[in-house]
Amino acid sequence: MATKKKKKHQFPTAYTVIIIVLLLVQLLTFVIPAGNYATIAYDTSNKDFVVTRPSGKKYKEPATQATLKKHKVNIAVKKFKDGTIYKPVAIPNSYERINLKKSNLWQAINQFFTSQVQGIAQSVDIIAFVLILGGCIGVVHANGAINSGMQALSKKIKGKQVLLIILVMGLISLGGTTFGLAEETMAMYPILIPVFLLAGYDTMTVLGTIFLGTSIGTMISTINPFSTIIASNTAGVNFARALPLRITMWVICTVVGMIYVIRYAEKVRKDPTKSVVYDQYEEDREKYLNDADFNKPANFTWQQKLSLIIFGIAFIVMIWGVQQKGWYFTEISVVFLTAGYLMAIFSGLSEHKVVQAFVDGASDLLGVALTIGLARAVSIVMDDSHTSDTIMHFFSQQISGMSPLIFIWFLFIVYIILGFFIQSSSGLAVLSMPIMAPLANVVGIDRASVIDAYNWGLGFISLVAPTGLILMSLMMVNIDFNKWFKWCWKLLVIEFVLCLVALGVGLLVY
């Protein structure tokens, strides 16, 4: 009698993971009381402050330093007026529970589905970017530019594979620490995956190089305006004072990350069976290398060369625009859409083939686009239930009165927890800094340490939080979350210990 083959257990997909998190958050809203901090924001139209009470009632006050002092908001008024602080800032000691009727079963079910649709609607700028990017990549693939490029590159990278990891990871980490390069790296996966596979590596190496690069960079932010700068301004401290420690920490963590990736990558290059994703080895090579023979000499047409040049220029313009002009996804999408039109014109393909290639490319990234929208639903449920401020208030009550070292370590863990629910760096900064920064004065430490705990805690949880960038990145390389965690958990322990040590050092040097 034939024995039945045991069915292999499969880890849930990214969609299911997000839905599970969404359900858990929704269940928490039945337990966690609703509450708000009062907030203060600058009205650019009327040139005055608008104070919003926890009840939602609003009133105006003069846009002066005296108004901020009255509310114990330790921020220079010019930071509001020049647009540096553009979000409502929480007012310390203003938390109040609000009388918000808890949802019944039907309302909860309705919110569960509605929040997902709202999440997709609110993420339309990022979704448009992802789909347009996919379309552009489809056109580049269709005219053979990528395969020809890989053939030309195959001989040049031979024996220099490690430099590829160092260069890519170093530049991405630099972008993360200086101007918050994060979601924009989605554009790099389709281009770098074939390059890394050609070098003998696997898709986990690509994920480690790109995602760890941006995660470490944004975690150890030095002059990132979306985290360190806005947190420093909200806390009322000069960010430049803490730069030596933060730069040192960034270099150490980036080098540690590089060593971790390189050791694994070289092991895989020498023996592909050592790959964490070896079960999809053939599938990945067939999908990304298209069975091309890279031993043949490259047959590069001028149309293919021009397509790659246009695509490369689009990347350069994107990075310049984000860093120098403060562009967001609408402007970036326009850049790649323009590049798509130009590549279509010079691709050498017929109109029908160009359109089909664009649609096929966009459809390949549709799953990533939907994941982005679903992840936003978690934040929507938190906002609608008014539980974020309650969680913040609870932790602020727990950490007051501790010794300096225990305080800053515990605060780091608090930000890891808060970062799971609030992935927006600027949003978490303006919500938490007015509450947490004054506690540093009570304990007797510099507020710069609080900013480090915020940055490093949020960045640390971003490495594994389903509400962050990781699930979208995993979908780009077709890797399950459990494989990612199995691969990176040792690095997580190392980075966690490094953060604790650096926070302790910060107490001595600030």
Predicted regions located by residue number:
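Long, contiguous bundles of hydrophobic transmembrane helices that form the permeation core
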Residues: 2-15, 36-56, 244-357, 477-483, ...
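Short helix-coil transition sites and intra-membrane helix breaks within transmembrane domains
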Residues: 122-126, 137-147, 176-187, 217-224, ...
